[in-house]
């Protein structure tokens, strides 16, 4: 029986390929659709209307308009780290460990 972490890994892979389709990469439009559906709170809370363009520029290392799985995973890892940092700060403020 798969562990929670194995399920999380599977979810990341399936989510990427759901939006990438057969081409094995995300276009800017694919990335926008993924972010709007899978991370709605992130885009809703952005004050910068160019946030998605900046994310795409950061992830598109080859400057070919494509985001591969490794870059997608870097985005998810960065968001997870930021969420963890926020969680840790607020848990400490509440006196929890």
Curated annotation (Swiss-Prot):
**GO CC terms of this entry:** cytoplasm
* Classification via Gene3D superfamilies: EF-hand (1.10.238.10)
SMART domains attached to this UniProt entry: S_100 (SM01394)
Q: Which domain of life is it from?
A: Eukaryota
The record's section on Pfam families has:
S_100
- Annotated region described as Ancestral calcium site, given as residue ranges: 60-71
Instruction: Recite the UniProt keywords alphabetically.
Output: Repeat
| InterPro entries per record | EF-hand-dom_pair (IPR011992), EF_hand_dom (IPR002048), S100-A10 (IPR028476), S100/CaBP7/8-like_CS (IPR001751), S100_Ca-bd_sub (IPR013787)
Q: What else is known?
A: Does not appear to bind calcium. Contains 2 ancestral calcium site related to EF-hand domains that have lost their ability to bind calcium.
Q: How does it assemble?
A: Heterotetramer containing 2 light chains of S100A10/p11 and 2 heavy chains of ANXA2/p36.
Protein name (database record)? Protein S100-A10
């Amino acid at each position: 029986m798969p562990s929670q972490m194995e399920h999380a890994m599977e979810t990341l892979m399936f989510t990427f390929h759901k939006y990438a389709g057969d081409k094995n990469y995300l276009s800017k439009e694919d990335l926008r659709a993924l972010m709007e559906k899978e991370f709605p709170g992130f885009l809703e809370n952005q004050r910068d209307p160019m946030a998605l363009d900046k994310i795409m520029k950061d992830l598109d290392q080859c400057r070919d308009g494509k985001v591969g799985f490794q870059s997608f995973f870097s985005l998810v890892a960065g968001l997870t780290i930021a969420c963890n940092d926020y969680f840790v700060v607020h848990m400490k403020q509440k006196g929890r460990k």
